[in-house]
A protein has these predicted regions:
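ABC ATPase NBD coupling module
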Residues: 25-26, 79-93, 101, 123-130, ...
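A short, flexible loop at the N-terminus of ABC-type nucleotide-binding domains that lies
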Residues: 7-11, 20-34, 84
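Conserved ABC transporter NBD signature motif
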Residues: 71-79, 239-241
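H-loop/switch region of ABC-family ATPase nucleotide-binding domains
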Residues: 216-217
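Conserved beta-strand-loop-alpha-helix hinge in the C-terminal portion
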Residues: 236-260
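The feature captures the beta-strand-to-loop junction immediately N-terminal to the Walker
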Residues: 48-50
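Helix-to-loop junction immediately C-terminal to a conserved catalytic motif
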Residues: 63
Length: 269
């Protein structure tokens, strides 16, 4: 028996994933350079890195926005390497930086939630709204503490950016995904709203133990949240910390690692 085996099953496996955009053209850019990453059930990994480090590209690869040039991606035991976004919808939920991208314009709060409840199946409103489901929606919205549970009939176009982002979060986890990816989902919000959405995120992720990958530029969030921290640079995983090593991190130590990565790049070039 392997006493060092992880007590939780592997949910996400990224192996040797590479991606180059505009290959052979003037704007050629290497987005991912042989990324290896494993997340177990309940892991909450925070991803940091400078602009162009590959953070959002990694999330896009996991979500299915493109097929990698090389490597493999497995989610909940299923090889999804070549599956497009809609074929991963039952496994991966995503919240974008732009609050407008996570909800369907022109529909009410309730109608958006009804669509989210059918994630991974046919997204239709037919027979989607009932008293029982309305109760589910109210219970899902109440913990946000911003009154959306009283605005089920409100068109989402009338919501503020923060309210819409909070709704996007609830929609993403209404049907628990295998993996939740958060791409700087608080970056476009004012500080007060960002704190509320982040608190709701942490509460929801912890309560359901959802395996989560969150990109942020907020160093304090990177230190305070999650059980793992990953730093990316030039499309690679430059540094990783978990457990006591993560708890010991400080903002100055992270800044120092950023500088070290840049210095290594300068030496290579």
């Amino acid at each position: 028996m392997n006493m060092l085996a992880h007590p939780e099953p592997v949910v996400l496996s990224v192996r040797g994933v590479e991606k180059t955009f505009n290959r052979g053209k003037a704007g050629e850019r290497r987005g991912l350079a042989g990324v290896d990453l494993t997340l177990h059930h309940g892991d909450f990994a925070i991803v940091i890195g400078s602009n162009g480090a590959g953070k959002s590209t990694l999330l896009s690869a996991i979500a299915g926005d493109f097929v990698p040039d090389a490597g493999a991606i497995t989610i909940a035991g299923k090889d999804v390497t070549t599956r497009p976004v809609h074929q991963r919808a039952a496994l991966v939920s995503r919240v974008f930086q732009d609050p407008m991208r996570g909800t369907a314009a022109g529909l009410t709060v309730e109608e958006n939630l009804a669509i989210a409840l059918r994630r991974g199946g046919r997204r239709s409103l037919t027979n989607a709204i009932s008293a029982r489901r309305r109760k589910i929606f109210v219970e899902a919205l109440e913990p946000l503490g911003i009154g959306l549970e009283k605005r089920l009939d409100t068109n989402v176009d009338l919501l503020s950016g923060g309210q819409r982002q909070a709704l996007s979060l609830v929609m993403a986890i209404l049907v628990e995904p295998a993996v939740l990816v958060l791409d700087e989902h608080c970056a476009a919000l004012d500080p007060r709203t960002a704190e509320a959405v982040m608190n709701a995120t942490i509460s929801a992720v912890r309560a359901a133990r959802i395996t989560t990958l969150m990109v942020t530029h907020n160093m304090q969030h990177a230190i305070d949240y999650g059980n793992r921290l990953i730093m990316m640079h030039e499309g690679r995983l430059e540094f990783e910390a978990g457990g006591e090593a993560k708890s010991a991190l400080t903002i100055p130590s992270l800044v120092s690692r950023f500088r070290s990565a840049d210095d290594k790049l300068l030496l290579v070039r």
